[in-house]
Every structure is written in C-alpha cells, then in structure tokens.
Swiss-Prot record:
Cellular compartments per GO CC: cytosol
Lineage, top ranks: Bacteria, Bacillati, Bacillota, Clostridia, Eubacteriales
Name of this chain's protein: Cytidylate kinase
Catalytic activity, EC: 2.7.4.25
Any single biological process term in GO: nucleobase-containing small molecule interconversion
Amino acid sequence: MKKNLQIAIDGPAGAGKSTIAKAIARQLGFFYVDTGAMYRAIAYKALRLNIALTQEEEIAGMARQTEITLEHSAARRVFCDGLDVTEAIRSPEVSRSVSIIAAYPEVRERLVELQRQEAGQGGVVMDGRDIGTYVLPDADLKIFLTASSEERARRRWLELQRAGKELSLAEVQRDMDARDHYDQQRAVSPLIPAADAILLDTTGLQIEEIVDRILSLFNDKVETGYVRSQNQ
C-alpha cells in the first residue's frame, strides 16, 4: 500500500475546509497542511513591507526568499521567517489581499514546492483551492466542499467576531464575493473541482456529519483496495 496516503480538500472561502481537514487529520493520525495559511503569510509579509499588491515581480521575489513553517502540533502555529503570524494572517486586510497574490504564477510555484515537501512527510490531509487539480493530482481521495454564499459569509463573520474583528455581515459578504470572483477567474489554477473529486455541499450540516462522511469515503477506498491498486 502507498506509504504517504493523501486526502485533498478543496473549496471556496467559508466552506469549512480547514475545520474539517483538521478533524480528519486528527482522527487518522495524518499531518494537516493548511495551504491557505501559506498564501496568507505571503500576503501579510507584503503588506507589512508596504509592497503594493500590483507589484507582481517584487512580491514573487519576496516569496522566493520567504521561509514558511507550519507547526504540526495541536496549536497549528504558522511561522513566517521565524515570526509567529498565526493570528495576524487572519485579519480582514490579509483576507482581501490574498487572492490577488495567490494569482501570481511565481508565488504559486514557490508555495506548491513547499506544499509538496510537506506532503512527503507521511499521510497528509491538505486543504486549499487547487490541491486536487494541481498540488496533489494523484491524491487518494479528493473532496470539493461548498456551501451557499450566505452560509459561507455567516460562518466567516462568526469566526471574525470570535477573534474580536468588528466587521458587518454585509462587509464580509462583499469581501467573500470578491474573493470568489478572483479565485474562479484567475488564469493559473482557478478554483474548480478536480474531475475525480467528490462534491459535498455543507450547507446546514454539522461538522461531525461531514467528517464522518469523508472518513467513510476514505475507508471505503482503503478497504476495497482502491488506494493499493491505484498507487503501487
């Protein structure tokens, strides 16, 4: 059987990717890789250095020289050049900037390199927007999560409220709609389901229901020999 089993979870902002991916990784004893945090770290650094978001070449050069470390402990800390940016990268300003930076090919090239290195460490659950289509095209299970735009905005708004960020639900909805547009229309690795991905609409579902469904799908593949036959 393939040693480094891979589960790819893609979907738009607010679909529940990170929460669900972390729960699955915990239950399976796999590594969890939040690729969105990597892009956020680059966006945060660009903002901190006052690099205009339109300066693609300068941002790409900066990304090539940036070290991003994801802590695989329960705390899930994110480090950018040794600095703990776990909370800082979740700001509304970073959220509004990240899709612009993520569309730059050389930035994606650098971060995909780091993401594939992470996947080589062992069994992994990785979430993002192009995991099943580009980062891990041979993943053993590919899931594409979605939910209604209103549901996703509400979830993100509640998340920001818990973090002490005072934004209205309408502002969060506008930011999310703009990000959806950027992600779906970008020329490099647009947000689309992989041809062999399983689509799950999480609207109105509890986290436990979604996690159980994905674990069942994964276990079915393992038990029926799918993983073994596809990855010898």
